[in-house]
């Protein structure tokens, strides 16, 4: 099932995508009892990022590459001002000289989770979505001497998410991840290459903070590459979908 948040006219709501149409649902999307009778064509709606401004995005750092002896991965937050929808813009900050894309699988939480064991973790998953954890590359070197920099990950529009939540993924531990820039393959990998798997990530984050329905955990990026003003960036994840954004000049 593909669950999307969308705007129809002046109304913002959630719905289920069926073919070329979207069927509005009432209430919250995390516990769908039935699909409503109100149907819109996808061409008539604007897709929004599939979360609200009250939802958290605790993102995972350094989860690909050589395995090491860490107990768990690093965690950082993407603040609500970074959220951007499918077909929305990534604003290239005027103060930055190097910006990179990071294509990631986002795990969407279905119910309140705190101190969750790895063995129970998948019971708290609603589905999966595409995330682009955009980062200001040069701040990694220029700011990190002062502590983990807010500038690295937190410029406005630096977290496109979407286009929808896919609830039916048989094996999220083996998903192909690709990122295209202007139609050319720029980076790729597979979730099988993660150092820490999804159950570990959910458990690890739930020891730090209480996860709520709709929170999204980006699981890390296998490869990155630079993006520039005028680029069209596409995150494509097997079984989930395609998240497309335009890179525009700061305003």
What is each of the regions a protein language model found here?
Residues 52, 100-102, 212, 228-229:
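Residue-level recognition of short, solvent-exposed, well-ordered loop/turn junctions
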Residues 48-49, 90-99, 113-120, 149-152, ...:
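A generic local secondary-structure boundary/capping motif
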Residues 49, 56, 97-99, 203, ...:
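Residue "hotspots" at secondary-structure boundaries inside conserved domains
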Residues 63, 102, 106-109, 115-132:
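RNA pseudouridine synthases
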Residues 1-73, 168, 172, 178, ...:
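N-terminal non-catalytic cap/leader segment that marks the start of a structured domain
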Residues 37-40, 67-69, 135-251:
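Catalytic-pocket segment enriched in acidic/His residues
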Residues 5, 24, 57-60, 105-109, ...:
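Short hydrophobic-aromatic micro-motifs
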Residues 73-86, 101, 234-238:
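Structural signature of FAD isoalloxazine-binding scaffolds in flavoprotein oxidoreductases
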